[in-house]
UniProtKB/Swiss-Prot annotation:
Protein name, per record: 4-hydroxy-3-methylbut-2-en-1-yl diphosphate synthase (flavodoxin)
Spans through the membrane: none
Pathway given in the UniProt record: Isoprenoid biosynthesis; isopentenyl diphosphate biosynthesis via DXP pathway; isopentenyl diphosphate from 1-deoxy-D-xylulose 5-phosphate: step 5/6
Its job: Converts 2C-methyl-D-erythritol 2,4-cyclodiphosphate (ME-2,4cPP) into 1-hydroxy-2-methyl-2-(E)-butenyl 4-diphosphate.
Length: 369
């Protein structure tokens, strides 16, 4: 039963992406991106709904042309979660999705074109209260910066970002957030550190093209974990070559590990050894699948023996310590003994019961004011 995070977050300007606050004192938002064909409205809506069920706060959708812009408009009408339109090169696409109700525009002012085109996009955003995300990526730096630095560097990423920030500020536009992504962890981390000292706008964190499910999860957890532990970051996106729903799960797991945001169960489980009195790995795998729908923040300890079991169980809402028989703890106190027969069934029942009690207690507290 872990308490508040000791992390002191960087103070940033609050903006709104649809109904979701970003920056300031708002919770760190978890974002993902669809990988379906935007013109396939049904498939994209289905994917967004799956992301919403997983807990996503904001979803980015690629809008490469005008046909996709019209499809985006239909998608927007069919989903509840705020949508970011990812736009490059053609400023008219940005103007169209602004008319269609987009919640945020992800652009790179450097590839939109002339000053009058950038101004048109900014004016459309301002008129409709739409924020902008400036997205800088190590793989697409401006040619003059590539020539100046020779290769992508943290300083090059930050110079590119500040160039675009100044561009928007010249147009008297302040409702934006910024990202400076790279596939190299150290480059991205240092770029965000430098940028955090230069601007007050919210920062969107990500390690771009991080890799597949396993390798990308590790790289993102290391890179984003370093920044979040320093208080840097207002939204996160875990870029994985995998089902986008996995990005949301990993994002929440990173935030949970730093006590920055809680959603669902925080499992504490031993890796198991020959001292285990039940199959820890099998038990954990079954519990994670069965309890995936549970959104109530709970700490659940699953420890195979009495070496560390009692200590971990005493710190959890629900704890299981292996023994002969096994011992269940509720709110840190021994509650009942269990054999291995129907162990997962009974543990699931107790966890759901505890979750219901927590929901009722929280509701009563709110009602009392």
């Amino acid at each position: 039963m872990h308490g508040e995070s000791p992390i002191k977050r960087r103070v940033s300007r609050k903006i709104w992406v649809g109904s979701v606050p970003v920056g300031g004192d708002a919770p760190i938002a978890v974002q993902s991106m669809t990988n379906s064909d935007t013109n396939d409205v049904a498939a994209t809506v289905a994917q967004i709904n799956r992301l919403e069920a997983a807990g996503v706060d904001i979803v980015r959708v690629s809008v490469p042309d005008m046909d996709a812009a019209e499809a985006f408009g239909r998608i927007k009408q069919l989903v509840k979660v705020p949508l970011v339109a990812d736009i490059h090169f053609d400023y008219k696409i940005a103007l169209r999705v602004a008319e269609l109700g987009v919640d945020c525009l992800r652009i790179n002012p450097g590839n939109i074109g002339r000053e009058d085109r950038v101004r048109a996009v900014v004016d459309a955003a301002r008129d409709r209260g739409i924020p902008i995300r400036i997205g800088v990526n190590a793989g697409s730096l401006e040619k003059d910066l590539q020539k100046k630095y020779g290769e992508p560097t943290p300083a090059a990423l930050v110079e590119s970002a500040l160039r675009h920030v100044e561009h928007l500020e010249r147009l008297n536009f302040q409702d934006f957030k910024v990202s400076v992504k790279a596939s190299d962890v150290f480059m991205a981390v240092e770029a965000y550190r430098l940028l955090a000292k230069e601007i007050v706008q919210p920062l969107h964190l990500g390690i771009t093209e991080a890799g597949g499910l396993r390798s990308g999860t590790v790289k993102s957890a290391v890179g984003l974990g370093m920044l979040l532990a320093e208080g840097i970051g207002d939204t996160i996106r875990i870029s994985l070559a995998a089902d986008p729903v996995e990005e949301v799960k990993v994002g929440y797991d990173i935030l949970k590990s730093l006590h920055l945001r809680s959603r669902g169960i925080n499992f504490i489980a031993c890796p198991s050894c020959s001292r285990q009195n039940f199959d820890v790995v099998k038990t954990m795998n079954e519990l994670e699948v069965r309890l995936e729908d549970l959104l109530v923040p709970l700490d659940v300890a699953v420890i195979g023996c009495v070496v560390n079991g009692p200590g971990e169980a005493k710190e959890a809402h629900v704890g299981l310590t292996g023994g002969t028989p096994n011992l269940i703890y509720i709110d840190g106190k021994p509650s009942q003994k269990l054999t291995n027969d129907n162990l997962v069934d009974e543990l699931e029942r107790l966890i759901r019961e505890k979750a219901a009690q927590k929901v009722a207690a929280d509701a009563a507290l709110i009602a009392r004011g």
